[in-house]
C-alpha cells in the first residue's frame, strides 16, 4: 500500500518549514521567492500531494466551495451556465455544490440556508424571484446573481445583454424580409431578462 504524502514530506523534499508549505497552499506567498514557489509547486506535482481541504478550511475559514442555487435545472439555457461555473471554479481550486429549486421560493430558501450552514465561500444564485425579500436579506459580499437582475437590491449580477441581442435578432429578421414577427415567451412579469427582451 502506497504511503500517503503529507505536508511534512513536501517540506522535507523542498527544504523549507511546514509553515512555508502551509502559506503556499493557502495562497499567502507575498514574502516567498519565485524560486521557492516553483520548488513547492514541482514537489506537489511530482508527489501527487493532496492537501486536506477540511484542515485548510479550519485555518483559512474558507471551505473553497461555491454553492450554486438554480431556479430550474431543466432550463436548457442554464446548462451552459452551470458548465461555465463548474469549469471556472475548478480552475481556481474550488469545488461546487449545485442545488435545484424547481421554481419554488420555499425550496430556494431551504437550499440557500443549507449552503450557508455548510459555510460555503460564496453563493451563485439563479433565483426564482430577484425582487423577493429573501434576496434583499442576502449578504452582498458573498452572493452573485446570475441571469436575473433585482430592482430592489444592489448585488453583483451576471446577465446576457438581452436588449441588444433582441435588437440584433430583429434587425436580421427584417433584413431577411420577414414582416410579421411574433414574440412568444413564458410569463414576463418579474423576470428581468424576459422584460429586457420584450422592451
Predicted segments, located by residue:
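N-terminal helix-turn-helix DNA-binding module of bacterial transcription factors
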Residues: 1-63
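N-terminal helix-turn-helix/winged-helix DNA-binding helices
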Residues: 2-6, 45-77, 81-83, 92, ...
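Short beta-strand segments enriched in small/hydrophobic residues
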Residues: 18-22, 58-72, 180-187
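Short, surface-exposed alpha-helical segments at coil->helix boundaries
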Residues: 34-37, 79-83, 167, 194-199
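Central regulatory/effector-binding core of bacterial HTH transcription factors
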Residues: 87-132
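Flexible loop/hinge segments that line or gate small-molecule binding clefts
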Residues: 125-168, 188-189
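Hydrophobic alpha-helical segments within soluble ligand-binding/sensing domains
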Residues: 156-183, 196
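Secondary-structure junction motif
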Residues: 183-199
Amino acid at each position: 500500500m502506497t504511503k500517503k504524502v503529507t505536508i511534512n514530506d513536501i517540506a522535507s523534499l523542498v527544504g523549507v518549514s511546514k509553515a512555508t508549505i502551509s502559506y503556499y497552499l493557502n495562497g499567502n506567498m507575498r514574502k516567498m521567492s519565485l524560486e521557492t514557489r516553483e520548488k513547492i509547486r514541482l514537489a506537489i506535482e511530482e508527489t501527487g500531494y493532496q492537501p486536506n481541504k477540511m484542515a485548510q478550511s479550519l485555518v483559512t475559514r474558507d471551505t473553497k466551495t461555491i454553492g450554486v442555487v438554480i431556479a430550474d435545472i431543466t432550463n436548457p439555457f442554464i446548462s451552459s451556465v452551470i458548465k461555465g461555473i463548474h469549469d471556472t471554479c475548478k480552475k481556481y481550486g474550488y469545488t461546487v455544490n449545485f442545488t435545484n429549486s424547481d421554481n419554488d421560493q420555499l425550496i430556494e430558501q431551504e437550499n440557500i440556508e443549507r449552503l450557508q450552514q455548510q459555510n460555503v465561500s460564496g453563493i451563485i444564485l439563479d433565483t426564482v424571484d430577484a425582487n423577493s425579500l429573501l434576496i434583499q436579506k442576502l449578504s452582498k459580499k458573498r452572493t452573485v446573481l446570475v441571469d436575473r437582475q433585482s430592482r430592489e437590491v444592489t448585488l453583483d449580477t451576471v446577465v446576457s445583454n438581452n436588449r441588444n441581442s433582441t435588437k440584433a435578432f430583429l434587425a436580421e429578421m427584417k433584413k431577411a424580409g420577414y414582416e410579421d414577427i411574433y414574440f412568444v415567451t413564458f410569463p414576463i412579469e418579474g423576470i428581468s431578462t424576459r422584460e429586457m427582451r420584450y422592451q
